């Protein structure tokens, strides 16, 4: 059933293969024949060929224009992507406001090195970073207090929750036994924002989402007994509506995210280093904060050794990229008769290239003319 519709806009909530699920804006549903949208305000869309030709990707979280709606089959075509406020590549999410990093205090035990790697990766996105620690009911008050004080030194104020009991998910502490364990609820923290939830596998991300949005019933897996790590249960990125308002993006779990940042930017991803740089400046503008004199960052703070480790990784990665670019610049791609591609060394200009017959003929004519002139 077709009609001359006005501009229909919506948000991409899921991407699978070449199809996009678009949740339409509330004003997209109209009176009369389109009242079905009130019950199912999601259209399964394809991407306009023009967008593909210009290289315009469609990501989860994108604000888009939908054309050619088929209200009976709930189909449509994405014809335009609005400019993005923010953009993440891994995971691919557009227009996110915050990253909610979820870890477990135990089962598996909380590893400071792994937590730091995830925090640095989250900080590198430029989004607001919130830290949520699950399974607080399985550790002692002393252990929990130690982690709270430790993370405060790192520059973070974590939320302690228990997915199993619901503590810290829906409401703040309600009695003296919970006082000191729960400062604020996750539900209230996420309202009105597009939040990307991420963290290693097996820490309870899917279970947390099931608590926040019970109707989803996401599949969960137990932690591997042999490896002490979680099994991946989320395979693709998807946005879910939160009952209290806002959207939550579930992402596949990772055990060790890759750090892909410039070495000079790394200090900005450590709150401790940022604080020191805000209070003073190093003697050298390009200080790497390793062995340079009069450095304000180098010093006695817990994660400084992690900073040095990640800095070395970033430097090695940068050198590998530069070497790779140089190698690619010296090669050219050739297509063989069977259709396969292969790379061959490029010849230096005017060094190994043979002169054309025309140039050779012209040279012979010039030589003959010189001989005639001498005669």
Task: Please report, for each region that a protein language model flagged, where it lies by residue.
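Conserved Walker B
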Residues: 105-106, 135-136, 251-254
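Switch/coupling subdomain of P-loop NTPase systems
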Residues: 64, 96, 113-127
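N-terminal accessory targeting/assembly segments
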Residues: 1-112, 364-375
């Amino acid at each position: 059933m077709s009609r001359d519709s006005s501009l229909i806009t919506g948000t991409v909530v899921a991407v699978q293969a070449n199809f996009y699920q678009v949740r339409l804006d509330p004003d997209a549903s109209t009176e009369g024949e389109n009242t079905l949208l009130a019950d199912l305000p999601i259209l399964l869309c394809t991407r306009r060929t023009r967008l593909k030709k210009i290289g315009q990707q469609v990501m989860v979280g994108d604000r888009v224009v939908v054309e050619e709606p088929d209200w009976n089959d709930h189909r449509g075509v994405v014809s335009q992507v609005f400019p993005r406020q923010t953009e993440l590549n891994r995971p691919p999410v557009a227009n996110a406001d915050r990253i909610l990093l979820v870890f477990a205090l135990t089962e598996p035990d909380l590893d400071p090195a792994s937590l730091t790697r995830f925090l640095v990766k989250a900080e590198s996105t430029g989004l607001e970073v919130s830290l949520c620690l699950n399974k607080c009911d399985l550790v002692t008050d002393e252990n929990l207090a130690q982690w709270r004080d430790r993370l405060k030194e790192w520059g973070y104020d974590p939320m302690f929750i228990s997915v199993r009991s619901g503590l810290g998910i829906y409401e703040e502490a309600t009695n003296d036994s919970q006082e000191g364990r729960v400062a604020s609820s996750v539900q209230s923290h996420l309202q009105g924002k597009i939040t990307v939830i991420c963290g290693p596998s097996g820490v309870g991300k899917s279970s947390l989402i099931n608590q926040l949005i019970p109707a989803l019933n996401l599949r969960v897996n137990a932690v591997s007994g042999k490896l002490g790590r979680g099994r991946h249960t989320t395979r693709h990125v998807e946005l879910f509506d939160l009952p209290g308002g806002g959207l939550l993006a579930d992402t596949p779990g990772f055990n060790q995210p890759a750090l892909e940042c410039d070495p000079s930017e790394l200090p900005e991803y450590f709150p401790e280093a940022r604080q020191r740089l805000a209070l003073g400046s190093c003697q050298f503008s390009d200080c790497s904060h390793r062995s340079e004199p009069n450095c304000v960052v180098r010093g006695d703070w817990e994660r400084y050794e992690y900073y040095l480790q990640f800095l070395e990784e970033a430097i090695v990665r940068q050198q590998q990229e530069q070497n790779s670019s140089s190698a690619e610049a010296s090669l050219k791609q050739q297509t063989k008769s069977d259709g396969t591609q292969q790379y061959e060394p490029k010849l230096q200009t005017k060094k190994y290239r043979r002169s054309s017959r025309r140039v050779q003929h012209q040279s012979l004519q010039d030589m003959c003319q010189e001989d005639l002139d001498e005669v």
